[in-house]
Amino acid sequence: MKTNYSALDISSFFIKKGVNPLKLQKLLYYSQLWFFVKNDSKLFNDGIQAWIYGPVVYDVWANFKFMKRGSIIPIGRAVNLTLDNLTINHLDDVWRSYGHLSGSDLVDLTHNDLPWKNSRKGLLSNQPSDKEVIINKDTTRYFTLDSNNKIPVIKTQNTLGHYSNF
């Protein structure tokens, strides 16, 4: 099992599915979080920051900051990298659980997650931050796999709805 991927490496999987930069950031966060829950290790080495609209991997943001918020990232921006089977299966599971949600739905979900909330403690809701989102046994204790050892599928109505116009 290779675990020294970069977040940009992992991004290519989701870019090939057709995502905008906002949705990509949240899928990276959930990929890292659930990989930790399943394997007690990180999927990629990059840190995740607690930005106003949820978790962000800075290097991935810098790569796609030129794009309009809702624009789908061109598939040509995906790198051709062979991921191991464990990683592919994991990313398929993340996509099955979260891929049907919009970027704004995912923003809402992340704002309710303990790792992001803990990282934003003491900050105003509109205050920029580069604090790291900590993913560990304490912050992921409420994330549980279903009876088939899969990530539960998230329903749209489970989101808070605050960023639906985002």
Task: Enumerate the predicted regions with their spans.
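Domain-edge interaction signal
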Residues: 1-166
